């Protein structure tokens, strides 16, 4: 599946050009259109931006490689990346992603740095390349923030499957949103002298201890979702502001199509701690309603389905002028969905994430739609990146995976896409879990 959406317009600022230089906005997203880099013919706007960046002298590949070698004891560019055929370059090989500027432009305080200089790429869900072949037997630690929801559980299952396929010894830590537990696991892996670590942070500033220790030990690290502090070799991430915009535009279109005045209250449910994905998703969602002065957007928080249920049930009573709701992640959406049903509410809900109850809610008309992404493809890209890195390849400093808008029109197709060919109707009938 060809990537239909590229990294958000804020990337233009990161690439040292003005926002006005971005491609025209597509309906349903704030992202510019990009094309695969080609060997000849007319330059795309992306290629022109990349050339401007190269010409400006802001990046020095040799200096970057020297710095990387100094920081980790490794050198890049010692081999070709076997996954290149699946990459859509947003920033060319030879450069590193200035992720701190990317997040600062979105209003998130970030000092995180990336060491790899293999550019920035969009990667597909339906990849055509295979896992790289390890040059030797590698031991890799994988710490996942938690596996309570389907996203975390599927990430872990896919990571295990990829490790088994590639012959990687995988050490696993399910941190259950406990940063101290995650730090302790990393400390133990450092003592074991693992070859590399893939890390999905619990606390995006509290993870500094682990990342600093890994750097000091010279152990390569790829983060699954970005940290906000310290540094790593590379990051596998989504363009979360785009997700928020997709969810917001879907809700706004529904309200306008049904003659609802854009006044009153919209509630959205988020997390009670700093999370870069949450901050950028909420920013994207709220930007859709920035021209609605009579509309209040109220944040509610929680970390479980039960907490989000209680918060939404209270909000239904506290805000009689509520016209819509947004679940920023799966537990928030499912909690609101359950509270909506229990209270006989007709409030339209829009969402991010593709857990099975959310897709069922879309099919049944209880959720307008959801900005979704694969929980399996990112694990493949993280493991591929780690193997390539350990093999001596200068990997991309950022892998951006696909966002897809799922509505009632395509929910059955997308259920099969996200769940390995399984059928939504079989899930609803209780024939599959």
Which residues does each predicted region cover?
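Hinge/cleft segment of the Venus flytrap/periplasmic-binding protein
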Residues: 76-138, 269-273, 288-289, 377, ...
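Extracytoplasmic "Venus flytrap"
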Residues: 84-97, 111-129, 139-158, 162, ...
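Hydrophobic alpha-helical
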Residues: 191, 199-216, 285, 301-361
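Hydrophobic alpha-helical segments within soluble ligand-binding/sensing domains
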Residues: 127, 134, 236-264, 280, ...
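Sec-dependent bacterial lipoprotein signal peptides
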Residues: 1-20
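Flexible loop/hinge segments that line or gate small-molecule binding clefts
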Residues: 98, 204-242, 265, 355-368
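Bacterial lipoprotein signal-peptidase II cleavage site
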Residues: 19-31, 40
């Amino acid at each position: 599946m060809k990537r239909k959406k590229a990294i958000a317009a804020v990337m233009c600022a990161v690439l040292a050009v003005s926002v006005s230089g971005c491609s025209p906005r597509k309906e349903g997203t704030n992202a510019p259109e990009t094309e695969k880099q080609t060997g000849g013919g007319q330059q795309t706007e992306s290629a022109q931006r990349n050339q401007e960046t190269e010409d400006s002298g802001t990046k020095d590949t040799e200096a970057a490689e020297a710095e990387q070698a100094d920081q980790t004891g490794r050198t890049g560019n010692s081999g070709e990346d076997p996954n290149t055929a699946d990459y859509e370059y947003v920033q060319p090989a030879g450069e590193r992603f200035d992720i701190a500027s990317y997040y600062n432009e979105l209003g998130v305080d970030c000092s995180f740095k990336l060491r790899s200089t293999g550019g920035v790429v969009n990667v597909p869900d339906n990849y055509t390349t295979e896992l790289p072949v390890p040059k030797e037997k590698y031991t890799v630690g994988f710490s996942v923030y938690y596996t309570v929801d389907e996203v975390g559980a599927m990430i872990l299952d896919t990571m295990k499957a990829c490790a088994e396929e590639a012959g990687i010894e995988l050490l696993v830590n399910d941190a259950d949103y406990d940063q101290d537990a995650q730090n302790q696991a990393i400390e133990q892996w450092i003592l074991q002298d693992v070859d590399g670590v893939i890390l999905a942070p619990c606390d995006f500033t509290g993870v500094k201890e682990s990342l600093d220790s890994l750097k000091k030990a010279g152990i390569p690290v790829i983060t699954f979702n970005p940290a906000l502090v310290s540094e790593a070799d590379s990051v596998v991430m989504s363009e979360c502001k785009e997700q928020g915009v997709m969810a917001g535009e879907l809700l706004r279109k529904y309200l306008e199509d049904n003659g609802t005045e854009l006044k009153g209250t919209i509630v959205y449910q988020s997390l009670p701690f700093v999370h870069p994905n949450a901050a950028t998703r909420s920013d994207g969602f709220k930007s859709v309603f920035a021209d609605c002065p009579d509309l209040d957007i109220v944040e509610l928080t929680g970390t479980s389905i039960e907490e989000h249920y209680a918060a939404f049930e209270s909000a239904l009573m506290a805000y009689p002028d509520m016209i819509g709701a947004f679940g920023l992640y799966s537990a928030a959406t499912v909690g609101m969905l359950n509270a909506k049903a229990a209270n006989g509410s007709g409030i339209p809900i829009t969402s991010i994430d593709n857990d099975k109850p959310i897709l069922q809610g879309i099919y049944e008309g209880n959720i307008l739609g959801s900005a979704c992404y694969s929980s399996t493809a990112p694990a493949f890209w993280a493991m591929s990146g780690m193997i390539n890195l350990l093999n001596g390849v200068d990997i991309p400093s950022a892998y951006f995976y696909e966002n897809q808008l799922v509505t009632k029109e395509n929910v059955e197709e997308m259920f099969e896409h996200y769940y390995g060919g399984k059928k939504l109707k079989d899930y609803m009938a209780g024939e599959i879990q």
